[in-house]
């Protein structure tokens, strides 16, 4: 039957005049962590005029939310240092390309603590899905 369909389509003038459409490209998934706090995701969000940072463990999906006085790299680093002191230094931290995370201060922090800082696409926020899901949950709880 497949052969019949292929023959029909190859002889069809309407079909041959249309460009070939290939399916969507396969998703490239981040590697799964093997232990807690191996990989964490971080994101900022606002709720009722107040800024927050969410930190989520990629292994367990456990997250914590901290209120920020400002959205500066210094303030975000200050909050993250508390998390790293409590849970340990991750191998990898995933964030978006927002100002605090793209700053020299944040890169210095990553180098000093020895973790890899990976940024997600600024256009495609879903690529940092763990953090985005934690933000959604946190907003509903707050």
Predicted regions and their residues:
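Retroviral integrase
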Residues: 1-141
């Amino acid at each position: 039957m497949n052969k019949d369909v292929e023959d029909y389509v190859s002889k069809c003038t309407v079909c041959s005049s249309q460009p070939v459409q290939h399916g969507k490209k396969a998703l490239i998934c981040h590697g799964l962590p093997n232990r807690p706090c191996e990989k964490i995701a971080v994101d900022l969000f606002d709720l009722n005029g107040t800024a927050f940072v969410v930190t989520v463990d990629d292994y367990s999906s456990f997250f914590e939310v901290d209120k920020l006085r400002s959205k500066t790299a210094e303030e975000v680093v200050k909050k993250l240092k508390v998390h790293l002191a409590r849970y340990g230094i991750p191998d990898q931290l995933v964030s978006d390309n927002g100002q605090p995370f793209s700053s020299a201060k944040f890169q210095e922090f990553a180098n000093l603590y020895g973790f890899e800082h990976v940024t997600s696409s600024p256009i495609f926020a879903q690529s940092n899905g763990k953090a985005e899901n934690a933000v959604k949950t946190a907003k509903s709880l707050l």
